[in-house]
Regions:
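Start-of-helix register in tetratricopeptide repeats
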Residues: 18-19, 52, 85-89
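Register position in tetratricopeptide repeats
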Residues: 29-30, 63, 93-100
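Canonical tetratricopeptide repeat
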Residues: 56, 89-93
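Alpha-helical tetratricopeptide repeat
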Residues: 17-28, 55
Length: 100
């Protein structure tokens, strides 16, 4: 019974993170960038090492013309990414934002 409770609790925690990320994605697609950042913050609290969260956060900051915040998010994306394509994308953005 104890294992079942732990399993259900962990499922709820991860579902919350995915739900917030889904809401952020929907808000981003609708052009509601500030609202999307709010959902990203919720998602980030439950999964601080997910590079996809930092990628989305960086893109939102770029859309809001907040290059310093975008640069920091891309640096975290690169730090936590194990995917070559995502790492490459982060490096391109970091280089571009560093030149501004």
């Amino acid at each position: 019974m104890k294992i079942l409770r732990i399993f259900i609790l962990s499922g709820l925690l991860f579902a919350g993170s995915n739900d917030a990320l889904s809401k952020a994605s929907a808000a981003m697609k609708a052009g509601m960038y500030k609202e999307a950042l709010g959902h990203i913050s919720v998602s980030q609290q439950t999964d601080m090492t997910n590079p996809d969260i930092y990628r989305m956060k960086a893109l939102l900051h770029e859309a809001l013309d907040e290059p310093n915040h975008a640069l920091i998010a891309w640096q975290y994306c690169l730090k936590y990414s194990k995917n070559k394509i995502l790492s490459s994308e982060a490096k391109v953005h970091i280089e571009s934002l560093s030149q501004e």
